A protein has these predicted regions:
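Extracellular and organelle-lumenal recognition/adhesion modules and their flexible linkers in secreted
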Residues: 18-422, 439, 449, 455, ...
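Noncatalytic carbohydrate-binding groove/subsite architecture in carbohydrate-active enzymes
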Residues: 341-347, 351-352, 471, 503-633
Length: 677
């Protein structure tokens, strides 16, 4: 009999317990049932319950009449080196012993450099043989224990340790339960056992300029691409040209003297039909909206501005002059929710109308932030927010987000899709932190950015009024320094997806030069170094330990496992434990860490998988994800001697704990857990 003694303060969300024989999994097959393990069930060319990659010229996946028993088997064939697989998810009882059996046949299988064809059980620790050459039907069998796992993915592979070629058949796969341990769960309270105090910074959050996290999420602006990065009517633009069959007949882009950015749209009005419009605006019941349009015309011109939904229309009449001016607009509240309102700008006289920029916000916004989203953010009570990225920061120039908001240049998002309007920069982020009573944590651009840019950013935030950057900050409306404490030197610079990514050796030098320059500006700031378990960490910690206070680590979990609830949930605490254990090893093995307490800043952690229904990477979360986040927070408690800060990534929409559409906002299942903690 296995006993699990659990300290009360660290009790997990899920306790391993015995599973009655009559109780079966909530989804999928019965315990130990591999559906269609003999490949006999087919519909047209589809082998039921098995998944294979999309069809390609390199490798073929099909059922074949060659069988060990019955009339069909799974087959993979490749003339050249390739990777092929058939996958099937199987539910297994936790704390049980199983026997796996499967039959394999090979014909001219060649592997380079190693491996071959064979079975793999993803989710449990077991070694299975590889096959090469030509072999008749051969039985593969192994016994294994599930532990706390409750699922496995069975993979039939051509190319187990690399690529392979040839032909391979798989048939008659099965699992047999050899026994299940009875788990006695007990709670033990030991007041004499004390761990390191848990840091309040464990409950931090992370927001990045991507998808609908900032724009379409936290920020209240209702108009997308309000500064016209894309020419209206062009692919990618939310703006449309009405009144003409071809956009170029009704509009051109003025690049000679743009109001902001690289060009400004000019409507060529015939006085009757031409209009610029944006659809799919959301309106909440009882909340009016206001904004403005910056315009000029080549002659005095009457312009109608309309907000309409179905047969309901509100119309404003403006008289536009020949120099740029900001024209205010206001629309009364609708008495019901509207998800597809249309905003239109309609010149009423023949001539040309320049539209420099436009803005529209609900009247309940708080300093530009959505009131409903802000209320949910406050409910999280997060002590620290990391900003602005993420991958985004490696291509971000913080100067773009400073100064008059309408004049800040729009940019293509350097790391993700969409347009960066630069409406939310340092001043707006700092105001958000004030509204949430939270601490700011700023990542500097150590990708494409330089040392001076980072040092100037520190001075802009923390310098006195007599410094060059402090003077500029005062000119932009903030005389008093913000005294930002937390700063990171870059983001994930170890990855080839990162703008400006480089070798560990090169980044060691770059980190140290950034740290020296940033500390020269303000020696009181706390610096966080880019980390990644393995050689990167070892090099950074060995060569930069004197120039950091914390080291960053990231992890995300998917649903690539066999589908079991416990397996899904336990991914989070297992990853936290894995990273913490690695850093304990570093402390033992790296001389530069002697006498230092460089703890982990887990500034990105979460589940990250589909379905993405809230914009770019806007994951929908389920109860199983909430349980995993709760288990993760409990694990942070257990690892409190190694983890100082953690930032759930990301807060709104993009893999976020808060979901917001144009009309509504609420906590995701993960948000409900974070709020409780």
């Amino acid at each position: 009999m296995k006993k699990n003694n659990i300290v009360l303060f660290g009790i997990a969300v899920l306790c391993a317990c015995s599973v009655p024989k009559e109780r079966q999994p909530l989804t999928g097959g019965q315990w130990g049932e591999i559906k269609n393990g003999s490949a006999e069930e087919v519909v047209s060319s589809e082998v039921l319950y098995w998944q294979a990659p999309p069809a390609s010229k390199e490798v073929l996946h099909f059922y074949d009449a060659t069988a060990h028993d019955g009339t069909r088997s799974l087959c993979i064939s490749a003339d050249g080196l390739a990777n092929g697989y058939w996958n099937n998810r199987v539910n297994l009882k936790p704390w049980s012993k199983y026997r796996f059996k499967g039959w394999i046949k090979c014909e001219n299988v060649v592997a380079e450099p190693q491996g071959g064809a064979g079975f793999r059980l993803q989710g449990v620790e077991v070694q299975l043989p590889d096959f090469t050459g030509t072999q008749d039907w051969t039985l593969v069998s192994c016994d294994f224990e599930t532990g706390a796992n409750d699922c496995v993915t069975v993979s039939c592979l051509l190319g187990t340790e690399g690529k392979a070629k040839g032909k391979v058949w798989f048939d008659d796969l099965s699992f047999e339960c050899l026994g299940t341990e009875v788990i006695e769960t007990s709670i033990k309270v030991d007041p004499a056992e004390q761990k390191a105090e848990m840091s309040p910074y464990i409950y931090g959050q992370f927001i990045e300029h991507m998808g609908h996290c900032i724009y379409g999420g936290i920020w209240a602006e209702m108009l997308m691409d309000r500064k016209f990065w894309y020419a209206p009517g062009q692919k990618g633009s939310p703006w449309q040209i009405a009144g003409t069959d071809k956009a170029e007949k009704g509009l051109y882009m003025d690049e000679t003297a743009p109001y902001t950015g690289r060009h400004t749209p000019v409507l060529k009005s015939d006085g009757k039909r031409i209009a610029l419009k944006q659809t799919q605006l959301g309106l909440r019941p009882g909340i009016s909206c206001s904004g403005y349009i910056v315009m000029k015309a080549d002659r005095e011109m009457p312009v109608k501005v309309m907000l309409n939904y179905g047969s309901f229309t509100q119309e404003l009449s403006l008289e536009v002059g020949t120099t740029y001016r900001k024209y205010p607009v206001h629309f009364s509240a609708f008495d019901h929710k509207v998800k597809d309102a249309t905003f239109s700008i309609c010149p009423q006289k023949e001539g040309r109308l320049w539209i420099g920029t436009a803005s529209l916000m609900p009247d309940d916004h708080i300093d530009g932030f959505r009131a409903d989203v802000l209320a949910l953010l406050r409910g999280l009570k997060a002590p620290v927010y990391r900003w602005p990225g993420g991958n985004f920061v490696s291509g971000y120039d913080w100067h773009d987000g400073i100064g008059e908001r309408d004049k800040r240049p729009p940019r293509r998002n350097p790391a993700w899709t969409g347009v960066e309007s630069n409406d939310v920069g340092i001043h707006e982020f700092m105001r958000l932190c004030e509204l949430l009573d939270t601490e700011p944590y700023i990542a500097v651009n150590a990708g494409l950015g330089g040392v001076k840019e980072a040092a100037d950013e520190v001075e802009y935030c923390n310098g006195t009024e007599d410094t060059p950057m402090g003077k500029w900050r005062k000119q932009n409306g903030q005389a008093k320094p913000w005294k930002v404490k937390w700063w990171s030197v870059g983001n994930e610079m170890f990855g080839d997806w990162q703008l400006g990514f480089m070798s560990t050796e090169a980044f060691v030098k770059k980190h140290n030069s950034f740290a020296d320059a940033m500390w020269k500006v303000d020696s009181s700031i706390h610096l966080i170094a880019v980390g990644e378990v393995g050689r990167w960490d070892e090099m950074i910690l060995a060569n930069c330990a004197d120039r950091m206070d914390l080291v960053s680590e990231h992890f995300y979990c998917q649903d690539w496992h066999g589908g079991g609830l416990m397996t899904h949930v336990l991914q989070i605490p297992r990853n936290i434990r894995r990273i913490a254990e690695a850093h304990r090893r570093y402390r033992r093995d790296i001389p530069a860490l002697e006498g230092k307490d460089i703890r982990i800043c887990m500034d990105e952690w979460n589940y990250w998988y589909g379905p993405h229904i809230y914009g770019e990477l806007g994951t929908r979360y389920f109860l199983r994800d909430a349980l995993g986040i709760a288990a993760g927070l409990n694990e942070f408690l257990r690892q409190s001697d190694m983890v100082f800060m953690a930032n759930y990534a990301q807060t709104v929409n993009v893999i976020g704990c808060i979901k917001a559409t144009t009309t509504d906002a609420c906590y995701a299942s993960t948000g409900e857990v974070l709020k409780l903690y």
